[in-house]
């Protein structure tokens, strides 16, 4: 198992949205069960919000890529919420 897999773990959508807000992204709109978030500099990402499910590592890595942050750093911010 590589180091990134050890550090990345599933997270609740609520915690991911809080972490993105701490990074300066704001919820622009919601469509169905997805929240579209945008940073003032133009970076965007979409977060699925399903109350009984967690966001898996692959999607967390994709969200981190969308906003231009290292996945491990993003996980650290999520864990601080």
What is the predicted function of each stretch?
Residues 1-29:
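N-terminal first-folded block
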Residues 6, 50, 64:
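Short, flexible active-site loop motifs that bind/organize anionic cofactors or intermediates
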Residues 26-59:
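A short, structured beta-strand/loop element
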Residues 55-81:
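C-terminal structural segments of small proteins and small subunits
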